[in-house]
Amino acid sequence: MPTIQQLIRSQRIKCETKTKSPALKACPQRRGICTRVYTTTPKKPNSALRKVARVRLTTGIEVTAYIPGIGHNLQEHSVVLVRGGRVKDLPGVRYHIVRGSLDTAGVKDRLQSRSKYGVKRPKS
Protein backbone atom coordinates (compact mmCIF):
# COMPACT_ATOMS: atom_id res chain seq x y z
CA MET A 1 0.00 0.00 0.00
CA PRO A 2 1.70 3.25 -1.12
CA THR A 3 1.68 6.38 0.98
CA ILE A 4 -0.10 9.52 -0.23
CA GLN A 5 3.31 11.11 -0.86
CA GLN A 6 4.34 8.19 -3.09
CA LEU A 7 1.07 8.52 -5.06
CA ILE A 8 1.69 12.27 -5.53
CA ARG A 9 5.19 11.52 -6.81
CA SER A 10 4.03 8.89 -9.33
CA GLN A 11 0.52 7.75 -10.23
CA ARG A 12 -0.71 4.18 -10.11
CA ILE A 13 0.15 2.17 -13.23
CA LYS A 14 -2.90 1.14 -15.27
CA CYS A 15 -3.08 -2.55 -16.18
CA GLU A 16 -3.36 -2.90 -19.95
CA THR A 17 -5.40 -5.90 -21.09
CA LYS A 18 -3.77 -7.93 -23.85
CA THR A 19 -6.06 -8.68 -26.80
CA LYS A 20 -6.68 -12.30 -27.76
CA SER A 21 -7.08 -11.44 -31.46
CA PRO A 22 -4.40 -8.84 -32.31
CA ALA A 23 -4.59 -9.31 -36.10
CA LEU A 24 -8.11 -7.81 -36.20
CA LYS A 25 -6.70 -4.49 -34.89
CA ALA A 26 -9.60 -3.80 -32.45
CA CYS A 27 -12.29 -4.49 -35.09
CA PRO A 28 -15.09 -7.05 -34.65
CA GLN A 29 -14.38 -8.71 -38.03
CA ARG A 30 -11.96 -8.32 -40.92
CA ARG A 31 -12.05 -9.28 -44.58
CA GLY A 32 -9.35 -11.50 -45.98
CA ILE A 33 -8.29 -13.69 -48.89
CA CYS A 34 -7.60 -17.42 -48.46
CA THR A 35 -4.03 -18.30 -49.38
CA ARG A 36 -4.30 -21.99 -48.47
CA VAL A 37 -7.17 -24.30 -47.43
CA TYR A 38 -6.18 -27.54 -45.69
CA THR A 39 -6.90 -29.94 -42.80
CA THR A 40 -5.04 -30.39 -39.51
CA THR A 41 -5.13 -32.86 -36.67
CA PRO A 42 -6.04 -31.67 -33.14
CA LYS A 43 -4.07 -31.99 -29.89
CA LYS A 44 -3.63 -35.22 -27.89
CA PRO A 45 -6.90 -36.65 -26.53
CA ASN A 46 -8.89 -35.69 -29.65
CA SER A 47 -8.73 -37.13 -33.14
CA ALA A 48 -10.16 -35.61 -36.35
CA LEU A 49 -9.32 -33.73 -39.53
CA ARG A 50 -10.16 -30.11 -38.76
CA LYS A 51 -10.69 -27.79 -41.72
CA VAL A 52 -8.60 -24.61 -41.53
CA ALA A 53 -7.51 -21.86 -43.91
CA ARG A 54 -4.54 -19.54 -44.08
CA VAL A 55 -6.00 -16.04 -44.60
CA ARG A 56 -4.28 -12.77 -45.55
CA LEU A 57 -6.30 -10.01 -43.85
CA THR A 58 -6.79 -6.43 -45.04
CA THR A 59 -4.45 -5.42 -42.19
CA GLY A 60 -1.71 -7.26 -44.11
CA ILE A 61 -1.33 -9.96 -41.45
CA GLU A 62 -1.64 -13.64 -42.37
CA VAL A 63 -3.54 -15.78 -39.85
CA THR A 64 -4.84 -19.34 -39.55
CA ALA A 65 -8.66 -19.42 -39.30
CA TYR A 66 -11.00 -22.32 -38.55
CA ILE A 67 -13.84 -23.20 -40.94
CA PRO A 68 -16.82 -24.25 -38.76
CA GLY A 69 -19.65 -26.59 -39.78
CA ILE A 70 -19.91 -29.67 -41.97
CA GLY A 71 -18.66 -29.14 -45.53
CA HIS A 72 -17.47 -25.87 -47.10
CA ASN A 73 -16.94 -24.27 -50.51
CA LEU A 74 -13.70 -22.42 -49.78
CA GLN A 75 -10.64 -22.59 -51.98
CA GLU A 76 -7.59 -20.46 -52.69
CA HIS A 77 -8.41 -16.77 -53.47
CA SER A 78 -11.85 -16.98 -51.77
CA VAL A 79 -12.79 -13.72 -50.01
CA VAL A 80 -13.84 -14.44 -46.41
CA LEU A 81 -14.90 -12.61 -43.25
CA VAL A 82 -12.79 -13.46 -40.18
CA ARG A 83 -13.86 -13.04 -36.55
CA GLY A 84 -12.02 -13.74 -33.32
CA GLY A 85 -12.42 -16.94 -31.32
CA ARG A 86 -9.89 -19.68 -30.82
CA VAL A 87 -10.20 -23.42 -31.33
CA LYS A 88 -9.07 -25.08 -28.10
CA ASP A 89 -7.60 -28.25 -29.59
CA LEU A 90 -5.82 -26.60 -32.55
CA PRO A 91 -2.66 -24.75 -31.46
CA GLY A 92 -2.16 -21.43 -33.26
CA VAL A 93 -5.75 -21.17 -34.55
CA ARG A 94 -7.18 -18.03 -32.92
CA TYR A 95 -9.74 -16.96 -35.52
CA HIS A 96 -12.97 -18.27 -37.08
CA ILE A 97 -14.32 -17.75 -40.60
CA VAL A 98 -17.89 -16.39 -40.62
CA ARG A 99 -20.21 -18.73 -42.56
CA GLY A 100 -22.81 -17.28 -44.93
CA SER A 101 -20.96 -14.04 -45.71
CA LEU A 102 -18.90 -12.95 -48.76
CA ASP A 103 -17.64 -16.07 -50.63
CA THR A 104 -18.39 -18.49 -47.76
CA ALA A 105 -21.67 -20.41 -48.17
CA GLY A 106 -23.81 -21.42 -45.21
CA VAL A 107 -23.91 -25.02 -43.97
CA LYS A 108 -26.24 -27.23 -46.05
CA ASP A 109 -29.33 -28.83 -44.43
CA ARG A 110 -28.75 -27.13 -41.08
CA LEU A 111 -31.93 -26.69 -39.00
CA GLN A 112 -30.66 -25.83 -35.51
CA SER A 113 -28.25 -23.03 -34.45
CA ARG A 114 -28.70 -21.65 -37.98
CA SER A 115 -27.51 -18.11 -37.25
CA LYS A 116 -24.05 -19.38 -36.29
CA TYR A 117 -23.66 -21.13 -39.64
CA GLY A 118 -25.21 -18.57 -42.03
CA VAL A 119 -28.35 -20.55 -42.89
CA LYS A 120 -31.63 -18.85 -43.85
CA ARG A 121 -34.91 -19.97 -42.28
CA PRO A 122 -36.33 -22.96 -44.19
CA LYS A 123 -39.69 -22.70 -45.97
CA SER A 124 -42.21 -24.56 -43.79
From Swiss-Prot:
Cross-referenced PROSITE patterns: RIBOSOMAL_S12 (PS00055)
GO biological process terms, semicolon-separated: translation
Domain of life: Eukaryota
Bridged cysteine pairs (disulfide): none
Record field: transmembrane: none
One of the record's GO molecular function terms: rRNA binding
InterPro entries: NA-bd_OB-fold (IPR012340), Ribosomal_uS12 (IPR006032), Ribosomal_uS12_bac (IPR005679)
Compartment(s): Plastid, Chloroplast
One GO location term (cellular component): small ribosomal subunit
Signal sequence annotation: none
Keyword RNA-binding on entry: yes
CDD domains reported in the protein's UniProt record: Ribosomal_S12
Keywords, sorted A to Z: Chloroplast, Plastid, Ribonucleoprotein, Ribosomal protein, RNA-binding, rRNA-binding
Predominant location category: plastid
NCBIfam families hit by this protein: rpsL_bact
Assembly and binders: Part of the 30S ribosomal subunit.
Protein name: Small ribosomal subunit protein uS12c
Protein species of origin: Ostreococcus tauri
Protein encoded by which gene: rps12
